[in-house]
Amino acid sequence: MPSRNLLLALTAGVIVVGLSVFAARAQAPAALTGQVSSAADGPMEGVVVSAKRDGSTLTISVVSDNAGKFSFPASKLEPGRYSLAIRAVGYDLGGPKTADVAAGSTATADIKLRPTRNLAKQLTNAEWLASFPGADTQKKTLLNCIGCHDLDRIITSTHDADEFVQAFDRMTGYYPGSTPQHPQRLIGDARRNLGAAAGVKAMAEYLASVNLSRDEVWDYPLKTLPRPQGRATRVVITEYDLPRKQIQPHDAIVDSDGIVWFTHFGELFLGSLDPKTGKVSEYPLPVIKPGYPIGTLDLETDQAGNLWIAMMYQGGVAKFDKKTETFQTWRVPQQWQTDATQQAFLTPTNSHVDGKVWVKNSDRAQILRLDPATGEWENLGAFKDTSNNRTITSYGIPADHDNNLYLLDFSSSNIGKLDAKTGNLTVYRSPIANSRPRRGRVDEHNRLWFAEYAGNAIGMFDPKSEKIEEWVLPTPWAQPYDVVTDKNGEAWTGSMLSDRVSRLNPKTGEFVEYLLPKTTNIRRVFVDNSTTPVTFWVGSNHGASIVKVEPMD
């Protein structure tokens, strides 16, 4: 089990960049400045400082530098009274807790921190996994948990192994987008698969060994990750609150007009956010399978700029015309429908090549193809890994420039490439064993970039060489969900467990990791290339907000 010192080295050693690189940069006018310090440590680098104006739906955050100094650009803070908050694991805000910002002047707030009395409450999922005793194979069983809830729900429980097994059985009957506030039961014989009974029992016994079922305190030390350093502190983060706490923005993307569009994982709406005004609009999708769970996942665009939505257990897909603000839907043919029919992902990106939209049916691991012009569906069925005759259970399904399809095999290490003309599948294996490719994108050079969820890495498949290259993330237990490249050739991903946004320079192998102000459960990632530097966007799936990350370089 890695020590805290090892965690520090793994992360800090990769992201530190000399501050002299930025010394010549002109400083923008500031609305609020100050220094963060504690009695024990003096000035503190890498503390996320957040400011939220009274009555506003926006929270602006910056990060303290190596002298403990922080600065909010004047362009980001309007005049008014602001509530202050911090994120620095192991510390709480001592004061001040508010600041008054006036037009044309710079306010000052020197922030004092004190040691926290409840470290466990501050730990990220990644820090919990680093803290747990046991083998990595045992810890990885918990990677299936954090899609629905944080690990502290498990860790602070007093369930014994038998009670965990009972809880698992109940959970298999709930829709993936269920929350404690908005539970949805699956219908009929649809169930989520937990695997063989022996594995379920072993997982239950492991969880009962790390929670509070045996004692009132944990019998292992709690380990923390280091705070950001150097270049990772040069960032401004904006969080836009959504109007209802039950909104789960799963996929968030930005169109050419600067409007953010997002899917609701637990409701049948398409949402939009105008970052300039903070206005949120919701467009209800039609119900096409009454009585079944509602919620949407994948959000993609076609060449004409139309938005396409995967409708999950509603058993179909939808297209939204932004000009007319109307939906068109296509339901999977009745003969292929079951209680478990689930359209989580679709790919219209290059449908202009052959007029076909790829759609995944998670039930039975089927690949479908839709002709929107005629409404006709094809069922290409499930595909096998010929080396072991195992079914490829794809997660993301991005398409290349010729509308050939990639199958990211979430239960193994495979990347399958499906020829759109012949229907033949070629399988490629990532060097990291059981890497569990999840979601990804094809770049301008027709290369596939993808997240290796269990491999804790970014992968890139080059179809010319037919080779896969990998870059392991510097933060242990980051478990990336998705990857996208920007106009500069850098690759971006985010952690479902550590609340860090990772930026990779593939030429040098260097990472920069930006710590977000709150628990975020990062899923789909998007980069807006119209800005310089580029801007990163993500939906806070468990936090009912949209997050914008603006690096200063």
Placement of each model-derived feature along the sequence:
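Conserved beta-strand positions in repeat-built beta-propeller and related beta-rich domains
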Residues: 260-266, 307-313, 357-363, 405-411, ...
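Extracellular beta-sheet/turn segments enriched in Thr/Pro/Gly and aliphatic residues
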Residues: 100-125
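Beta-rich, blade/repeat-based domains predominating
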Residues: 245-257, 289-304, 335-354, 385-402, ...
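Short, acidic Ser/Thr/Gly-rich low-complexity loop/linker segments typical of extracellular
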Residues: 54-71
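Blade-level signature of beta-propeller repeat domains, shared across WD40, Kelch, NHL, RCC1
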Residues: 516-553
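A short, solvent-exposed loop/turn motif at the edges and junctions
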Residues: 55-57, 79-98
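Structural motif
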Residues: 35-44, 77
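The canonical Cys-X-X-Cys-His
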Residues: 141-152, 203
